[in-house]
Amino acid sequence: MRIAVIDLFCGMGGFSQGAIDAGAEVILSVDSWDYAVKVHKENHPDVKIIKMELGHPSHYRMFKRLVDEYRAKGYHVHIHGSPPCQALSNASRRDASEGMPLVLWFLDLVERCDPDSWSMENVVPVRKRLPEGTPSVVLNSADFGVAQTRRRCYAGEGWVAEPSHSKEDWLGVINVLPHLNDLIGYAPANSMKSHFKHKRIQDPFPTVTSQSPRQLRLMMDSGRSSSKTSGINPRTGKKEGGSGPLFREVNQPSYTVMSSPRVLKTDEPQKIRSLTLPETLILQGFNPDYKLDSAKTQKNRWTMVGNAVPPPVAAAVIRGVQNGVFN
């Protein structure tokens, strides 16, 4: 049975890309942001995409007709949605209730359209605000081969996303961006290995010696260096409150990709350079050649990349649908 996907609040096309990678047919994508629609169309010219402000009850009938049409053709129809989530994020100071209307609208749409399966991606805090009985899980992108520990709530039915990577096998930034080794260019001297052995990435740098320039480790800024809402204590690296610089070595998965570039630093730390957009696309699970020119400005590009669903996670959801349909 063929799988048809309707992708709502589609952005630049992360879920659409993953669905296509998994062998599904995306029959419609919808978003209200003109630049995101243009980028989506540029990368998926064969997918019908509509620029439309979602959230009105009058839209239910339109999507119900589409579900019925493709079901009659023998398709399994899957509806996905990624309603805007800024007010629901842990990093937001806005009232979280501001972010719920479109979430509830989407859930109502699913109930009225009755697709064969559905999924909704949002930030983790939305999970506790979902109506009672709404099935949901928290998925970590690193479990699906993405070099980033991006955790998101996925509500839905008709699928189970099976991880492809255990924690021991998570991809580090350096695994997917091996050219960053050129910024390191050293192996710690044997005499220093025990000195570094018990040092965490949050600890002060050891005694500076003539070998120090070759013993600096390349690290990635979390992007939350002064956030008071991250809940991370920079001294211990644990979720116990606090704010301040927070870094992770590049042999580990990236922090969640957001709408601004990650900064590469040394262990002092001292900025080397920011990650480029093609590098950040890779950290999100996209092909680095994914076309962003239609977005016009760098700010628009960073925003849509930071908001995108990592395609490998979307592909895992659709493969979960396939496993349920074909087994």
Ranges and model annotations:
Residues 8-12:
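Class I SAM-dependent methyltransferase "Motif I" SAM/SAH-binding loop
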Residues 33-34:
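Conserved SAM/SAH-binding beta-strand->alpha-helix loop
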Residues 18-25, 43:
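A short, Lys/Arg-enriched amphipathic alpha-helix followed by its capping loop at the start of a domain
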Residues 38-71:
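S-adenosyl-L-methionine
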Residues 59-250, 255-256, 272:
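Class I S-adenosyl-L-methionine
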Residues 1-5:
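Extreme N-terminal starter segment of soluble prokaryotic enzymes
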Residues 314:
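Acidic-aromatic/histidine active-site loop/patch
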